[in-house]
């Protein structure tokens, strides 16, 4: 039951975070960010947000820095939009799955040549 609720809250957070990051964050360091996944612990205390960023490595690091500075604002926005007793503590991480998928696709394409 706790896992089902955590999954529902993660999906709701993913939707709300996408809107918050695209419309509310005015930091120029935060560029084109896509929320790819959100994992919430069973006790709803921690939320790990996976993001992908369009740009080079410096742009990714700047975006992560901008998001970490705006973490309090983002958490309060989530708290206002989703009715929870306590809003989960948010951490941002890069989603490496897209890059790994592209790398594997390139390798497979090279093998077929």
From Swiss-Prot:
InterPro entries: KH_dom-like_a/b, RbfA, RbfA_dom_sf, Ribosome-bd_factorA_CS. This is Ribosome-binding factor A. The gene is rbfA. NCBIfam families: rbfA. It comes from the Bacteria. One of its GO terms (molecular function) is ribosomal small subunit binding. The keyword Cytoplasm applies. Gene3D superfamilies: 3.30.300.20. One of several proteins that assist in the late maturation steps of the functional core of the 30S ribosomal subunit. Associates with free 30S ribosomal subunits (but not with 30S subunits that are part of 70S ribosomes or polysomes). Required for efficient processing of 16S rRNA. May interact with the 5'-terminal helix region of 16S rRNA. The keyword Signal does not apply. It is found in: Cytoplasm. One of its GO terms (biological process) is maturation of SSU-rRNA. Belongs to the RbfA family. Pfam families: RBFA. One of its GO terms (cellular component) is cytosol. Monomer. Binds 30S ribosomal subunits, but not 50S ribosomal subunits or 70S ribosomes. Transmembrane segments: none annotated. Keywords: Cytoplasm, Ribosome biogenesis.
